[in-house]
Amino acid sequence: MRKNLSFQMKRKRTNIFKQHPKGLYFLFFTELWERFSYYGMRAILVLFLISETSGENPGLGWSKVEAINLYSWYTALVYFACIPGGIIADKVLGKIKSVILGGFLLCIGHLLLSVDKISFFFSGITFIVIGIGFLKPNISSLVGSLYKKNSTLREQGFTIFYIGINIGAFAAS
């Protein structure tokens, strides 16, 4: 009997991930990547801004005050952008299109940051802020829409999703 119970417990553990909709894992990795992007920017933005303009790893050579000002605006605007991003999703685009658009804008923003021109830097930051504004307020509600309201898997699904958020944040730090 004990052997049978052990087998059932193992079987239950290995199948838990197969019980969830496939869309959960797409959203898991999307949010992991977005949080890696956000916390990665938070980790290196000020360092890049205050680094000397020449040398092995050139930056923009800003003062610490200027760098902290931009960092503050970036952080505030990322979360403020979620308000119009959510409204546009609710009234015009829908959640799915908003998440896709947000991810696309994030990619463009990071590509623009790779170009060594100040105008591309500001454009990249702008695309990232707008991208997060579309993605962040909508992706969590998409996770919820994968499950029936009273599904026992719904809570597990959100836990898996939040694990992705934490992995992304941890990896970026």
Regions from the PLM with identified roles:
Residues 134-148:
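Intracellular juxtamembrane helix-capping segments at the cytosolic ends
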Residues 2-39:
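Cytosolic juxtamembrane N-terminal segment immediately preceding the first transmembrane helix
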Residues 101-122:
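C-terminal ends and interior cores of transmembrane alpha-helices
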Residues 78, 155-173:
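Glycine-rich segments within core transmembrane alpha-helices of 12-TM secondary carriers
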Residues 43-66:
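Short amphipathic helix-loop junctions that connect adjacent transmembrane helices
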Residues 91-103, 150, 154:
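Cytoplasmic membrane-interface "Motif A"-like loop-to-helix N-cap segments
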